[in-house]
Curated annotation (Swiss-Prot):
Predominant subcellular localization, coarse grouping: cytoplasm
Catalytic reaction equation(s): AMP + ATP = 2 ADP
Subcellular location: Cytoplasm
Cellular component, GO, one term: cytoplasm
GO molecular function: adenylate kinase activity; ATP binding
Keyword Transport included in the entry's annotation: no
Role played: Catalyzes the reversible transfer of the terminal phosphate group between ATP and AMP. Plays an important role in cellular energy homeostasis and in adenine nucleotide metabolism.
Name this protein carries in UniProt: Adenylate kinase
A biological process from GO: AMP salvage
NMP: region residues: 30-40
Subunit structure: Monomer.
Length: 40
């Protein structure tokens, strides 16, 4: 299962992703976190 959450900053994407991860065995991958890690 692939799910993509899109929205403006503060829209609740992270909150929704956390709830989805609790109910389904899928990983939560934050592209924002990946980007920040890559530029450091």
């Amino acid at each position: 299962m692939n799910i993509i959450l899109m929205g403006l900053p503060g829209a609740g994407k992270g909150t929704q992703a956390s709830e989805i991860v609790k109910k389904f065995p899928i990983p939560h991958i934050s592209t924002g976190d990946m980007f920040i890690k890559a530029i450091k």
